Amino acid sequence: MTFRKSFDCYDFYDRAKVGEKCTQDDWDLMKIPMKAMELKQKYGLDFKGEFIPTDKDMMEKLFKAGFEMLLECGIYCTDTHRIVKYTEDEIWDAINNVQKEFVLGTGRDAVNVKKRSVGDKAKPIVQGGPTGSPISEDVFMPVHMSYALEKEVDTIVNGVMTSVRGKAPVPKSPYEVLAAKTETRLIKNACAMAGRPGMGVOGPETSLSAQGNISADCAGGMTCTDSHEVSQLNELKIDLDAISVIAHYKGNSDIIMDEQMPIFGGYAGGIEETTIVDVATHINAVIMSSASWHLDGPVHIRWGSTNTRETLTIAGWACATISEFTDILSGNQYYPCAGPCTEMCLLEASAQSITDTASGREILSGVASAKGVVTDKTTGMEARMMGEVARATAGVEISEVNVILDKLVALYEKNYASAPAGKTFQECYDVKTVTPTEEYMQVYDGARKKLEDLGLVF
């Protein structure tokens, strides 16, 4: 049966008021894991240890499983404790009418984001920045300037302000509103000081409420050529605050960046099951959020990292499948275990850059070093590595990529529990000149040499 009209956030709100009742425990502990397991068995999904898929028949089965996951489960609204269901025609309408390309930034600093494919020879867009990591107010500008100074970086992804005017940005307080506005204003000033005043940014990251996110669209702050973030909840869940934010973004004609990080070892379960949920989440981004692009980030439940063997496999298969069967634009965010100024951090980021570039990602977003939870532990050098590795990987045969990845991950995967803490931005850079220390440059060269030994050609 055909649909009455294209689905949007207003329809979501209406259905969230009348949908099937369900407790959150039943959703998290029964519906999601059981359906994911059922679909894995139904389609015989087995990735056989490949980071990037070479079996197109298996990719098609994965796409069908992800589509079916979304169709049969729907999305859980945490405010009303009800399930929002879509019809099959509504889902296909969203998939068939995605935003196929868009521009981030303005003037000579603008970049055109357009579809890539598995094994594409074109380098993906590099969105460099703290990626939601906490950054001290006194170094907020120089930290972001360290990314804008890197030519490998195309756009900026914001960090979180730990304070504004010396006060914590408490959700739903005046300070949250001030921080949401100040965050992007400072970053745009940092870009201007780096000689790139038209760079696009992605945020806001500091605010946690709808009023904070909405207030970031302001004079000198977020504009319609920036990526505006809204986050889905784990797994296949959302709250009504986010739906209100989507309504604002749509009404403002903003670029919408729908974000979600599926958890390996969490509610969905294992590798194949989590990838099914990841594919469903990508599709949900374009129907629920009217997303311009989806920011992925499979993360390991134990290590809090996106760079493990399991999470790279999930990311590689999900992206390749979405790229093969849809025009949905996709990015991935980076959370290494190790901190800045360490070889392990750079190698972790490199493994993910290789995976994302080869699997067809349009945007690489990072790097949130030290798992993105330690204040000031993120610098532009990690983004440089992400970009250089992406350039070296673009166009390499997938079979060769899988061999390189297997060897690369083996170099660091036994060290998660003892990952080096690394150094803060203030220890890695001259804060006044915003230049890396000699020590970090030597560490960088050492990591680059190891990548060359594995077969990457810079």
Curated annotation (Swiss-Prot):
Kindly report, in one word, the top-level EC class recorded for this enzyme.
Answer: transferase
Q: What are the BP-aspect GO terms?
A: methanogenesis; methylation
Pfam families, per database record: MtmB
The EC number(s) this enzyme carries: 2.1.1.248
Keyword list, A-Z: Methanogenesis, Methyltransferase, Pyrrolysine, Transferase
Gene3D superfamilies named among the record's database cross-references: Monomethylamine methyltransferase MtmB
* Annotated metabolic or biological route of this protein: One-carbon metabolism; methanogenesis from methylamine
Q: Which catalytic reaction applies to this protein?
A: Co(I)-[methylamine-specific corrinoid protein] + methylamine + H(+) = methyl-Co(III)-[methylamine-specific corrinoid protein] + NH4(+)
Q: Under the GO molecular function aspect, what terms does this record hold?
A: monomethylamine methyltransferase activity
The role this protein plays is:
Catalyzes the transfer of the methyl group from monomethylamine to the corrinoid cofactor of MtmC.
So what family is this one in? Belongs to the monomethylamine methyltransferase family.
- Protein name (database record): Monomethylamine methyltransferase MtmB2
> What is the protein's species of origin?
Methanosarcina barkeri (strain Fusaro / DSM 804)
Task: Give the lineage.
Answer: Archaea, Methanobacteriati, Methanobacteriota, Stenosarchaea group, Methanomicrobia
